[in-house]
Amino acid sequence: MSNRYRDASLSPEERTEDLLAQMTLDEKLAQLQCHFFAHGDLQKDTRYGIGQISTLEFRQALSMEEASGIQREIQETVMNNSRFGIPAVFHMEGLCGALVQDATSFPAGIGRGASFDPALEEKISEIVSRQERALG
């Protein structure tokens, strides 16, 4: 198995070509899938890797620290199950704020749109992105 895809001195195109040439069809298809960690078997569902993890169930965590710990555990499992150590992308809804305990909650988009205040919307998006990034 070639490790050229990990060689940072190569172009992204060369690295991608090397990685895709080594991946099986099942591994490629797994990169297109999303896993809801509260449903199903994480070990089984990520045996070929996984492209995305939904964080919708993170709202059950009692704190940002707990949610972050859950995310680290899931990422470790995903990367250990992938022959190539490919990390998952964690997907979080942020329309009205980060869906985790203690995050700021904002009005729905239609209410914010009715304010006709683009600067307010920009500020809200900055807050939501900062809170989601804090999760990891």
Q: What is the meaning of each model-derived region?
A:
Residues 1-136:
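N-terminal beta-rich core of secreted/periplasmic extracellular enzymes
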